[in-house]
Regions:
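Anion (oxyanion) recognition and catalysis
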Residues: 20-23, 27, 146, 185-186
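Aromatic/hydrophobic pocket-lining residues that form π-stacking "cages" and hydrophobic walls in ligand
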Residues: 22, 33, 141
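Glycine-rich, aromatic-flanked loop segments that form ligand/cofactor-binding clefts
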Residues: 27-51, 58, 189-192
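Active-site neighborhood of glycoside hydrolase catalytic domains
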Residues: 46-52, 56, 61-168, 174-188
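Flexible, acidic glycine-rich loops studded with aromatic residues
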Residues: 151-168, 174-299
Length: 299
């Protein structure tokens, strides 16, 4: 997608060959790379390059910072799905893993509610709720992924629409949209837990402390899913738009990454014992040149 690449700041994009090299680097270390292309929200750069994919086709400047924006992909236009199919066909071929994250979070419906294309689509489908219009959008994208042998992963926001397919994996990040999560799990849906109140590592240690991470429990609406067969595990997130250097990145990760790694495999044990072991790990990491948060900043 040359137009979008030309608009990138400081050449911050990957060539296909670079993607392949990252995947191979991870494979040799026992890791899989799962791509995410968030949609219909968080598509500001996509719409800046291709304005016709939004509801009103207005020119949009490429954003220089993160945020939530009202201009999102238009589900009322057939060309939106034609573009997505071309995009996913190209990207799916690069990634061998059978999972593909399509986001679905933080998608304001402001423009959809004024858009004649969206209104026409809703009338044709017999929909009255704009969350269900997003549900329609999600189903269309999931169908494209299935043609490429991929299983969709979505943020838990998408559960605000009706009858989300339990073949999709839900990633729980926010209590704001947690009410539908238990019913999805009870229907057999699989969930990854990434609660922002503990497992978002772009938050400073003063907010999501090492102690808080170590004692995190996968609780939704007062119920623990620690022993549920539908709880796939934990994923810590680190959104990097405000991370300027590799050293800052490492400081945010360590030693919190040790904590989430331990509790993902075992129940939390004695925290003082964990802290002692974390200190030893930090000493080793520091000798390897890793910039870890010092102990006085852990909690």
């Amino acid at each position: 997608y040359r137009r979008q690449r030309q608009m990138c700041i400081r050449d911050r994009y990957y060539t296909q060959e670079e993607i392949r090299s990252v995947i191979e680097y991870a494979r040799l270390r026992g890791m899989e790379i799962i791509p995410e292309i968030d949609m219909p929200g968080h598509t500001r750069s996509m719409i800046a390059a291709y304005p016709h994919l939004s509801c009103f086709g207005e020119k949009t400047e490429l954003c220089q910072f993160g945020g939530i924006f009202e201009k999102i992909l238009c589900p009322g236009k057939d060309e939106t799905f034609e573009f997505i199919e071309k995009l996913l066909t190209e990207v799916c071929a690069l990634f061998p893993d059978n999972r593909f994250h399509i986001g679905g979070d933080e998608a304001p419906k402001t423009e959809w509610k004024k858009c004649p294309h969206c209104k026409a689509r809703m009338e044709a489908l017999g929909l009255t709720d704009y969350e269900d219009l997003q549900g329609y959008f999600t189903k269309r994208v999931v169908a494209i992924l299935k043609k490429h042998g991929k299983r969709a992963v979505c943020w838990n926001d998408v559960l605000e629409s009706k009858d989300v397919d339990t073949g999709n994996i839900i990633q729980y990040w926010t209590a704001q949209h947690e009410a539908p999560v238990p019913a999805f799990i009870e229907r057999g849906g699989k969930v990854i837990f990434s609660n922002m109140s503990a497992l978002y590592f772009d938050y400073p240690h003063g907010i999501n402390s090492l102690n808080k991470v170590y004692h995190y429990q996968p609780v939704v609406m007062g119920k623990s899913y620690a022993d549920s067969p539908n709880m796939l595990g934990y994923e810590a997130a680190l959104w990097s738009e405000q991370v300027e250097t590799p050293e800052h990145l490492e400081e945010l990760l360590f030693p919190r990454l040790y904590a989430v790694s331990e509790i993902a495999w075992n129940e939390a044990g004695d925290y003082a014992d964990f802290e002692h072991r974390a200190e030893k790990k930090i000493e080793i990491a520091a000798k390897q040149g890793v910039n870890c948060m010092t102990k006085d900043g852990w909690n």
